[in-house]
Design a protein with these regions (language model features):
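Well-ordered, non-membrane alpha-helical segments in soluble/globular domains
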Residues: 38-51, 95-98, 125-129
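Short, charged/polar "capping" segments at the starts of alpha-helices
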Residues: 67-72, 124-125, 146-153, 188-190, ...
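Rossmann-like adenosine-cofactor binding region
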Residues: 162-228
């Protein structure tokens, strides 16, 4: 796997001829602060792909600055290059996100009303739903597939003795929720619901805007973590990259959720920031 980053002071020749620099596991682009135009972005993406093809690699982590170059990253995606973005890890850390909000906002977990927007059941989502249900006052599952989730509702009731609500009422489902955990609803669908105006909405897939004029809450689209062991983070990576991306890339995803959570606990991973469009907590 390679890391892709900007150059602090690219020389004129490198910029003119789009010369990429390779240092160990880092691909350094001949750009600094400027926004890339379409032609240059495509040339850099093509040259990046050639390096990755030679190394038989199709997964990369991009720096914070390169994330601000959508033309370049879109071209990488179009060439089937996987960009690690921390979204898989964000879903894994769903309950820890609830814990973090509870701590920062000084609201006890047992007083929280949480709605979870979800249409697809996975081992990860089931684990987090049960964890949230055990610790929060009220949990609503908002879904278009009520019958599918009724089975899960009965399973949680039988095994944990906890009642959750399965609903798809656009007028009432989200009207009293302190926290809305959006696992997989797209923006168009989410905006059809009546949302509590002071709610904190956590969008696992990111890049969602709430169009309600009366909404005064927070729409979280990104996050950052802290890790106990920072062997993966040399000085350059510590400054230029998001820890969440590097940590996600280190994880083996095809293993039982219990094993994943055991590693997260051992590494003392915790949420340290949640980022909205114009604010953070």
């Amino acid at each position: 796997m390679f890391f892709i980053q900007e150059c602090d002071k690219p020389n004129k020749i490198s910029k003119m001829f789009n010369i990429l620099k390779l240092e160990q596991d880092k691909i350094i682009l001949p750009i600094d602060e400027e926004k890339l135009e379409i032609k240059k972005a495509n040339k850099l993406a093509i040259k990046t792909k050639k390096i990755l093809d030679i190394a038989n690699c199709n997964k990369v982590i991009i720096s914070k600055k390169i994330k601000e170059q959508p033309l370049y990253t879109n071209y990488l995606n179009s060439y089937n290059i996987e960009i690690v973005d921390g979204k898989w890890l964000f879903e894994v850390l769903s309950y820890k996100t609830i814990e973090y909000i509870s701590k920062v906002k000084k609201i006890k977990e047992e007083e929280l009303s949480v709605s979870i927007l979800i249409n697809k059941i996975t081992e990860t989502s089931l684990y987090n739903i049960r964890k949230i249900a055990r610790n929060c006052k009220r949990v609503n599952i908002v879904t278009n597939h009520i019958e599918l989730f009724k089975k899960m509702e009965n399973q949680i009731l039988d095994e944990d003795g906890i009642m959750i609500t399965i609903t798809n009422n656009k007028r009432k489902s989200l009207s009293k929720s302190n926290i809305i955990l959006n696992i997989d609803f797209p923006q168009e669908l989410l905006n059809q619901y009546n949302i509590y105006e002071e709610a904190i909405i956590v969008n696992i897939q990111g890049n969602i805007k709430i169009k309600k004029k009366r909404f005064n809450g927070m729409c979280v689209n990104d996050y950052e973590i802290q890790v106990l062991n920072d062997e993966e983070f040399d000085y350059d990576k510590e400054i230029r990259y998001n820890k969440k991306d590097i940590y996600e890339a280190s994880m083996y995803k095809r293993q039982p959720m219990e094993n994943i959570m055991r590693k997260i606990k051992r590494d003392k991973v915790k949420i340290v920031n949640l980022f909205g469009e114009n604010s953070s907590i």
